[in-house]
Amino acid sequence: MIKNYFKIAWRNLIKNKAFSIINIAGLAIGLACFLLIALYVMDELSYDRYNTNAERIYRVDANVKFGGNELNLAVSSDPMGATLKKDYPQVEEYTRVYGSSGSKLIKKGAEFIDEERVCNADSTFFNVFTLPAIAGDTKTALNEPNTVVITESTAKKYFGTADAMGKIVEADKTPYKITAVIKDMPHNSHFHFDFIFSMDNVDYQFGNYLSMNFHTYILLKKGTDYKSFEKNFTQVIGTRDKTEHSIIGDSIIHFPGFA
């Protein structure tokens, strides 16, 4: 019986060739569009999900008010992270990223390469974010000044091999020791760094709540209601720096063009 159904269907297709071609082409285009949209949505929703603790990682943003105008900034002040960890038991860890929109001149042989995918980060960076190491211990890699963590492709680019542990790179005429090599950052991440330098090498004298220079991330303890936490800390911190702060969950927000 099924065989007869196929025969009838085939005869109808042959009988109405033009109509059949239009229908089949339309169906194929519709399916292709559906698959492309589905893949795009899945990719967007996967941003930063590679982090083991993605559901508990948040970025501290500042809503700065100047007169009647309000500015939403993806940065916060120098002491923000340390203050939150000290004053709020809900905060398990924090880390700061500095200079993500800058660049450094990296020496390679006799030439200098202007690298834009660079930043400075606290030693706690790898306690918050999951970036697998190929060599070295990322938990301690940025504990000292003049240290840097690089990606696998960067190691091969500068040294011809991923085995770059202990080697020296010169950035802006300052030597840095490579203390860890990590896998290249996934495409579905709002981080796109090739060099992560120690925060100890950042020459800043800010130390107040009005200097918005850092991207601050916090790792909340399991079971924390971040909405109530955000409301509480906004009231307290806002009295110190005259701004309103908010936390953005980096497990669910895609930050385009951050780095």
Task: Locate each region found by the language model.
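N-terminal Sec/SRP start-transfer signal
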Residues: 1-31
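Generic recognition of well-ordered alpha-helical segments
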Residues: 4, 8, 15, 78-82, ...
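Glycine-centered tight turns that cap/initiate beta-strands
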Residues: 18, 89-93, 163
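Short aromatic/hydrophobic contact patches that present stacked aromatics
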Residues: 26, 59, 215-217
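Alpha-helical transmembrane segments
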Residues: 29-58
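Short amphipathic beta-strand/extended segments in non-transmembrane regions
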Residues: 58-62, 77-134, 240-241
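Mid-to-C-terminal secondary-structure elements
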Residues: 119-134, 146-259
